[in-house]
């Protein structure tokens, strides 16, 4: 064995031994999450609506929430600027031009919109909206896209019944089942 290979093997062994020693001596940082903390983040909503919380909201109520919490990033009536558009784009997915992906043209399930808004919006205060505010702002966005009427109320029962324009625009597959 050459000196170079011997040094390389020795250096590798030393690096591994150091890593093991460091891991054994590292400080105990953090703590285990409590059941309450875990429950607070267990908020996933599936396409079928399982897990939707109590609450409700209308497009009119959502307009006020949108004006206070969303317009700075998504523009007047969801038109975009500086961030993503939320409205329009219907009919742009198939075609020669780049698609305009919005809630009204791309998202397949209204429950997924709820889930995303609830956990990630507003961008600088994620998870800060009440359930009623989330239902309301989702109702407003759906209304702007012509998916629900002005007088509709979104809640755990009605939201899962909304048929999004692109619901059938995705290919489903099974993972070996």
Describe the function of each predicted region:
Residues 42, 54-81, 87-88:
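Sequence/structural segment immediately N-terminal to covalent heme-attachment motifs in c-type
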Residues 19-23:
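Sec/Tat signal peptide C-region and signal peptidase I cleavage site
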Residues 63, 79-118, 122:
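Gly/Gly-Pro-rich "capping" loops immediately C-terminal to redox-active cysteine motifs
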Residues 46, 67, 71, 75, ...:
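Sec-exported extracytoplasmic/periplasmic mature domains
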Residues 60-67, 79-80, 107-110, 128-131, ...:
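Sequence context surrounding c-type heme c attachment/ligation sites in exported
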Residues 9-18:
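Bacterial N-terminal signal peptides
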Residues 124-177:
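Flexible coil segments in periplasmic/lumen-exposed cytochrome c-class electron-transfer proteins
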Residues 28-65, 122-125:
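Electrostatic cytochrome c docking/interface patches
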